[in-house]
Structure formats: structure tokens, C-alpha cells
Amino acid sequence: MYRNTMRSASRPVIASLRSSTIRAAPRRFASTAPADKPRSFKGSLVRLGLAFGAVYYYNTSPIFADEAISKTVPAPAAFSDDDLPTVDSIVEEKRKQIKAKSEETAASSKTPESQQSNPQTAAADGSPAALEEEAGQQGAFNPETGEINWDCPCLGGMADGPCGEEFKTAFSCFVFSQEEPKGMDCIDKFQGMQECFKKYPDIYGAELADDEDGAPTPDFGDEQPSGEPTTAEVKSNGELARETKDKTAADATKFDDSQKPAESKTPAKTTSTSTDSAQKPAVDAHRDAEPKSDAETASSGSRMVQDVAIPIEKPVNDKYWQDMHKSEVQKKEVTVGITQAHDATAANEEIKHIERQEAAKKNAEKKQ
């Protein structure tokens, strides 16, 4: 009973509401745009957030990613610094190549005669530079450890002879020398080795013959090694400077005792100023005018010097008083000290050493 009454009472109310809503919402077609309504701030934020989210998803999602390239470039081979060639490895490889080439050439061109004469040739060509080059090629010297194999046949057995210790000292000094040119600080040791060779000419005859056939002794002219005092001119009055002569003789004796070499030394050559000047025709007349007694006192140690030279030729320019007047100027005595003579032995050794280096370079170029 109560339900029926409620339904009957609610029906007119529901009908009125439906009619009011239909009247309030006007009808429109699907193609027509809805009426513009003001949008709220929250709705704008939601729309912006959705737009940013869509863009982010498009950029990061693998669904929209481009397809991978089918053909890819292979990655470069990975290697460490240990695999790279070093300077030592390159030098060692070159030495092995040189050693292999030398062994091939030696095996192809070797004959029984060359095998017999090989030790003699090595002994004759036993210059420090050549021995060092050959020792480096045949493995006698190891630059990494600094060891020298004295039993190497490239040394010609010189390390085992009676002068073996002298040879080892000189050769090792030359190998480790840092001077330029190389070996300049080892001249004394090589001189000692040569002196030892001279004591055994039957064993080291080839070495001595090679040294004798080397470069000739250089001509130093008036500056040849001499143990005697320098010859000087005489006084015009013919008197000797006795005090100067005694002092010069004493100095010459000291100089001979201190500068005399061990065995081999070039003989002293005394050259007087009067003898050298005799070759000049312009001075011959002046020399002939002097008495013989003045010429005999040429080794007094004093030198006569003029303040102004006397012109010999005819006047060239009349404006200069030297060409107009020939005036004899009084000579005065000047004491000349003893000049130290050159050491010809050391000079010869240096020249021979340089020639040996050049010969070693030529041999190395030929072998290459």
C-alpha cells in the first residue's frame, strides 16, 4: 500500500524534471561545434601534462625507435702499449738482419784460403773502430748489458796473447768512450798497447806493419818537435848574451827530461833563422854583410828586433815617409822564451785513429 502511494507521488516530480532538462539542453547536430565554455586552470595543467608525457614517451619508447642498420662497421682491434714496437726492439731487429746478411755473404763467398787468412786479416785490420763494428755485428759486445765477449773470433785472438791485458784495457776504453772524436781519451792506453806489441814482434808483426804503413808524419814546418831551444838572431855587435844563453840551456835540459816520449819520438830538427832566411834573395845580401862570428852565435836565445822595418823595394807612394827615407834603426835585444814543441807521436796516433774510423765506416757501408 505504501509503495503504490510513493510511486504515484514521485511520478509527477520525475516527469517535471525530465521536461526541464530537455528544455535546458538545446538540441545540436553532430557536425556542429559545441558552445565555447571557459576552461579552468586545473584542466589546462592536466592537458599540458598529458602533452609532455606523450612527447617523452615518444622519444624514449623503443616502439617508435628507428630500425638498426643491418650492416655495422667492425670495431677496431684492441691492443695495448706493450704491442707497439720500441726503439730497442727495432735496433735489435736491425742487428739481427745485419747479422743474417753478413752470415749469408760469408757463407757464399768463403773459401779455405780466406778461412786461413781470416785471423791474420783481423789482426792486421785491428783498428779500434773496425774491431768495435765487427764485434757488434758478431755479438762480441752487448750494448744492453755492456759485456764484451773476449773469446769472439772477430777480435783475432788479441785478447789471449801476451799483450791481452793491454788490448782489453784499450779496447774497452774505446768502446765506452764518450769523447768526440771517439777514443780521444784512450790514446795513452793505445800507446801502451803498441809498446807491448813492439816487445813481441814475432806475434804482433802484422799490427806493427799496419801502423808503419799508416799515414806519414805531418810536416809542421818550423814548428817540428825539438828538445833544443829556439834558435835566434845574433846581436849586431857580435857579443853573446851569456846570461840568457845559460838560462836557455838550463830550461832546454828540463824540457828534454820532461817531454821525452817513451820509445818512439821524431828526431829533433834544429832550424835556424839564418838558414831559413838564406832561401830568400831579398835577405841574402843583408846576411852576407854580417861576419861569420855573428852567425856562429845564433843559438844565444836572444832575438834582435827592429822598431821599424827597412823597405827593400822601391818607393811606392811618396806621401809616406817610410817610402821616402831609409833609416837604420838601432836594434834592441828581446829575450824569447822556449816554445813547447808539438808531440808528433800523439798527433800521428790521432791521425791514424781518424783514418781507422773512416776505413771502418767504408767497410760497414760495403757490408751493407
Curated annotation (Swiss-Prot):
GO process terms (BP): protein import into mitochondrial intermembrane space
InterPro entries: CHCHD4
Cofactor: binding details: Cu(2+) or Zn(2+).
Mitochondrial matrix compartment segments: 30-47
Membrane topology (UniProt): Single-pass type II membrane protein
Residue ranges with Low complexity bias: 264-280
Protein's recorded name: Mitochondrial intermembrane space import and assembly protein 40
UniProt organism field: Gibberella zeae (strain ATCC MYA-4620 / CBS 123657 / FGSC 9075 / NRRL 31084 / PH-1)
Taxonomic lineage from the root: Eukaryota, Fungi, Dikarya, Ascomycota, Pezizomycotina
